Amino acid sequence: MWLLLPLSFLLTSTAQDGGKLLEGEECAPHSQPWQVALYERGRFNCGASLISPHWVLSAAHCQSRFMRVRLGEHNLRKRDGPEQLRTASRVIPHPRYEARSHRHDIMLLRLVQPARLTPQVRPVVLPTRCPHPGEACVVSGWGLVSHNEPGTTGRPQSQVSLPDTLHCANISIISDASCDKNYPGRLTNTMVCAGAEGRGAESCEGDSGGPLVCGGILQGIVSWGDVPCDNTTKPGVYTKVCRYVKWIRETMKRN
């Protein structure tokens, strides 16, 4: 098993070749207007979701001391107008978060200055129900992507690189019973599995904290899965947002 590590960790580690949004393609620019990029000391670290003008939701394992929030992004290396830079005044991981078991892998960030809502920057809707097996969803992120390059023998070899642009993958919700067969004894009722038939997780390291959106509703946060994620048919595991709506709303109200 593995945790979907923040990209800042991967960039300072060795031999981390698995991190990518598998089989994903570049998203239509600003088609995911709730998508957030979290930065640490000037480096892209994790994904996140805008849920209100003042609040961003991500994974607790993305927590760091120096977090900057970038909204309205598509190409991280170019500015085309709608981008907004914000600072987090409060970083609030779930009080029961457990790094070892991945339980309660959810975190709220309060922005010092609220987001200015535009067609390219707007909140995603929180769920009023939990997702159903087979429900169609989209996972998005700037995690590492793979591509084939000619190798020294002339045969194509898989290479990985950090994409400039936001990538999306179409996946669907996997039933708890089916997912439990892949991760026996590891799942809780605060986790949900999603993947693509015969292709596995789709999300991988670097996509951490990003949104799993089903029918315009935020149903999951990229959390953990199998390793190596570019060579598995097991689904990815996401924090099940519907189980945390009460905590989210109460925390926002108190802060």
From Swiss-Prot:
Residues 16-20 form a propeptide. Disulfide bonds join C46-C62, C137-C214, C179-C193, C204-C229. InterPro entries: Peptidase_S1_PA (IPR009003), Peptidase_S1_PA_chymotrypsin (IPR043504), Peptidase_S1A (IPR001314), Trypsin_dom (IPR001254), TRYPSIN_HIS (IPR018114). It comes from the Eukaryota. Residues 21-253 are annotated as: Serine protease. Keywords: Disulfide bond, Glycoprotein, Hydrolase, Protease, Secreted, Serine protease, Signal, Zymogen. Residues 1-15 form the signal peptide. Glycans are attached at N170, N231. Its main location: secreted. Its EC number is 3.4.21.-. One of its GO terms (molecular function) is serine-type endopeptidase activity. One of its GO terms (cellular component) is secretory granule. It is found in: Secreted. GO terms for biological process: proteolysis. It is an enzyme of class 3 (hydrolase). The active site is at H61 (charge relay system), D105 (charge relay system), S208 (charge relay system). Protease whose physiological substrate is not yet known. Belongs to the peptidase S1 family. Kallikrein subfamily. This is Kallikrein-15.
